[in-house]
């Protein structure tokens, strides 16, 4: 089915045969249902993954869904929100809350796509840094009744709170092979809230995306609804910035370890006492196991709200 016909007249993109761009019927119906219900103080979260692989077209599909959401909001409520790379796409987790607040205060029923630069390359490392930022974003910006799209390579890298309870669906993208052994993008499997919960529970250990059956599967066309060249340039710039940010984060972590070491050795404080004092002074949740893992170099365990 073609959607957003008024925004994409003939000549809007290469090989266009009719106004609008193609969207799978059931996917469109799902978005329409959310658009209908958003007025009753709901917000929605879509996770788009790529079976742990890269270059499968996740970003293109995410932008198409965001574009159609914006179009459908306009048609149903008469609210014409902006839809631009600057306002609606986030490349760094550190920008989520800032952009989310700005969008929520500026627009009603807006849409934000988190398409983190470098996530495809860094995998678990990238997601572990982003998880707390995503949680903080949902805490602060959940009241804005927005559509939020998390575009990530690996669904199973998410903590269970986001993967199962805080999101409405999973759209997993994959590559197929045609009759000439050529790889083709443009296919997805859609998991509803109950289905993705089963997938996470049964598939996480082996990262098995076929641990349970999807609700439906479909296709999308390789149509950029935002300027492709500008998008690629912004993402490349975001990658360069990310390298600088990562070095700063590593330096801060070394400072933190040094401070904890001084508290242990010079002041003879236990991890429990350090956690208690941090909690009291900073008014935040603090756990002794965090400091234990920090100093031993172990991976932080996922903590769900």
Name each model feature, range by range.
Residues 1-41:
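N-terminal pre-Walker A segment at the start of P-loop NTPase domains
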Residues 39-45, 263-280:
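Short, charged amphipathic recognition helices of the HTH superfamily
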Residues 45-70:
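Glycine-rich phosphate-binding P-loop
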Residues 67-87:
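Post-Walker A helix-loop "phosphate-sensing" segment adjacent to the P-loop in P-loop NTPases
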Residues 85-148:
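Conserved nucleotide-sensing/catalytic segment adjacent to the nucleotide-binding pocket
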Residues 250-269, 302:
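Short, amphipathic alpha-helical "recognition" segments used to contact nucleic acids or chromatin
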Residues 270-272, 276-296:
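Short, basic interhelical loop/turn and adjoining N-cap
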């Amino acid at each position: 089915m073609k959607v957003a016909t008024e925004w994409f007249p003939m000549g809007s993109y290469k090989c266009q045969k009719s106004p609008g761009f193609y969207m799978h019927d059931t996917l469109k119906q799902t978005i329409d249902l959310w658009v209908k219900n958003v007025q009753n103080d709901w917000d929605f979260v879509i996770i788009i993954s790529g079976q742990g692989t890269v270059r499968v077209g996740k970003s293109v599909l995410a932008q198409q869904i965001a574009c159609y959401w914006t179009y459908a909001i306009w048609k149903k409520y008469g609210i014409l929100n902006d839809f631009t790379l600057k306002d609606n796409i986030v490349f760094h987790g550190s920008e989520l809350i800032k952009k989310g607040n700005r969008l929520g205060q500026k627009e009603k029923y807006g849409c934000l796509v988190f398409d983190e630069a470098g996530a495809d390359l860094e995998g678990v490392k990238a997601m572990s840094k982003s998880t707390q930022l995503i949680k903080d974003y949902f805490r602060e910006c959940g009241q804005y009744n927005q559509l939020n799209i998390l575009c990530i390579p690996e669904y199973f890298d998410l903590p269970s709170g986001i993967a199962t309870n805080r999101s409405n669906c999973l759209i997993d993208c994959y590559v197929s092979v045609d009759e000439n052994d050529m790889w083709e993008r443009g296919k997805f499997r859609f998991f509803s809230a109950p289905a993705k919960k089963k997938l996470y529970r049964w598939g996480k250990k082996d990262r098995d995306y076929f641990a349970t059956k999807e609700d439906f599967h479909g296709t999308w066309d390789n149509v950029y609804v935002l300027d492709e060249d500008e998008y690629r340039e912004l993402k490349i710039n975001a990658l360069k910035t990310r390298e600088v940010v990562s070095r700063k984060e590593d330096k801060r972590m070394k400072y933190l370890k040094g401070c904890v070491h001084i508290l242990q050795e010079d002041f003879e404080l236990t991890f429990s006492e350090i956690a208690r004092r941090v909690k009291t002074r900073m008014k935040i949740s603090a756990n002794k196991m965090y400091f234990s893992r920090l100093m031993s170099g172990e991976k932080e365990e996922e903590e769900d709200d």
